[in-house]
Amino acid sequence: RDVAPSRGLGDVYKRQIYIGVDDKDIDLFESQYVVPNGVSYNSYVIMDDKIAIMDTADARVTDKWFANLREALGDRKPDYLVVSHLEPDHASNIQKVAEAYPDMQIVGNAKTFNMMGQFFDIDLTDRKVVVAEGDKLSLGKHELTFVMAPMVHWPEVMMEYESTDKVLFSADGFGKFGALDTDEDWTCEARRYYFCLLYTSGAA
């Protein structure tokens, strides 16, 4: 549910590595949407002079997600965790990864941090990087530009555009239900995804 990743743990444009996890055991996404082909929890690592983790994953796949993260990092440690929004399938492991890497900074917008205390008991004093529309974060060769996208489909949603490889990390803005290795009618599922998750959150 972001930029289209390669299958498994592979490079997505040079040094942008997919560390997400397929979940084929789930029957209902968010306890309401039927997902006969499961879902994918999409997460990435951008490897550069500075390392950024782009979202985490659902608590259902914590162990596998951490294994993918550690494989991608090797002997390095992340500098940033970029939080697109706090929906559990993107954000459930924020506290665990913040505790695992105590020097890592957390990147979000003002609404992100206003809401975070409702989900996690975590002290982010001196660890918050608060961004707004158009702000930039340099990782070295890669640079992220932040685009606010409230109510797509949570109030604090933001997207990130990486200008070197021209990749948009679109949070829940584009995509479909279904695990990545499922062969299905992409157009039909993308339409259902839009009307279930996005259409109801837009302006009347």
Predicted regions and their residues:
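Active-site metal-binding motif and surrounding structural segment of the metallo-beta-lactamase
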Residues: 49, 60-107
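Single conserved hydrophobic/aromatic residue that forms the stacking wall/gate
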Residues: 1-13, 199-204
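Active-site environment of divalent metal-dependent phosphoester hydrolases
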Residues: 88-91, 113-115, 153-154, 175-178
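Conserved beta-strand hairpin/beta-sheet module of binuclear metal-dependent hydrolase folds
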Residues: 16-69, 159-162, 166-170
